[in-house]
Amino acid sequence: MSAASKKSLHNKIALVAGATRGAGRGIAIALGEAGATVYCTGRSSIKSSAKRSDTPGLRETIEETATLVTAAGGRGIPVRVDHTIPADVKKLVTRIQRQHHRLDILVNDVWGGDSLTEWSKPFWKVDLSNGLQMLKQAVHSHIITAHYAAPLLLAKPARAREHPIILEITDGDAFYYRGNLFYDLVKISVIRLAFAMSRELRKRGVVSVALTPGFLRSERVLDHFKVTEATWKAVGKRKNKKKNSGDQNDAPSDFMVSESPRFIGRAVVALATDPKVMEKTGRVFSTWNLAREYNFTDLDGTQPHWGNYARKRYGKYKICDDTFYSYWTPGLIDLVFPDWF
């Protein structure tokens, strides 16, 4: 990240829903690095009760994330919220309204579906309750949060060079099948959610986009491969020399093009500070393409490009490009009711 971007979000108010770990934590810290006040929400808290804590065995908390945000140069505010409970979200938004009277950035990153995803099983053989819970956690929560937060995003007059923004965090920048029916529904749904919200917000000056990381080097991934952020590269290179070792903890070759959670965080900052970001509303973007457009890097100074790697290793796949979006707009509702929203 260039020095010019430091404090570029000073006095901005952000809400990162699902900031405990992974992409959410990386985004929250990057927003703090840019000087923002960041509400860091989630269920995993030092104050968690046994019934409402997040996935057992995971050590990260929202308080820790908030501390990291403040250390990066912003102001981190931890708030324990279950985003599937409307009353919880309404209470949070009421607090932000009372304290700041507006919201500039909303990041919907609530997920928690790793333990619910049953790979290599067709939909009629998976645990239905797990699949429905995944939809509740990772789609319903996003809708609930956007519903209550939208009036605060709209409360700030849209100036010519400044737009409040909603970012939906997903997996993948295309409409290919993602290997599990419920996982697929979640990741495609939030892309569509960003688009649908953009149609209702665009004339009001609020931007709505979806954003995907590449191979995310999250805390859980580092733990799985028994490495740290400091050792992952050397260990990955060594393990990749072993072919078909059978060790499930051996890092795949894909791991060498992975990105830290701060990479997607810097993508969020780039979008939030772009005066022309309204031109992007309604679409899905990737960290690797935005890094080249906005000239930001990962923590190690690199610009990992998952798209190029995937095409080289697995073959070409079609992303959501201009041709793809030409089928989305204008739609029949736009043609019949041109003043709709």
Regions from the PLM with identified roles:
Residues 67-85:
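Rossmann-fold cofactor-recognition segment
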Residues 57-63, 80-92, 128:
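The beta1-alpha1 cofactor-binding region of Rossmann-like NAD(H)/NADP(H)-dependent oxidoreductases
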Residues 6-48:
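Canonical Rossmann dinucleotide-binding motif of NAD(H)/NADP(H)-dependent dehydrogenases/reductases
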Residues 146-147, 195:
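A short, exposed helix-loop element centered on a Lys and neighboring polar residues
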Residues 210, 227-339:
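C-terminal helical subdomain
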Residues 112-116, 124-134, 154-203, 212-229, ...:
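Catalytic loop of short-chain dehydrogenase/reductase
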Residues 72-77, 95-108, 114, 127, ...:
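A glycine-rich helix->loop->beta "capping" turn
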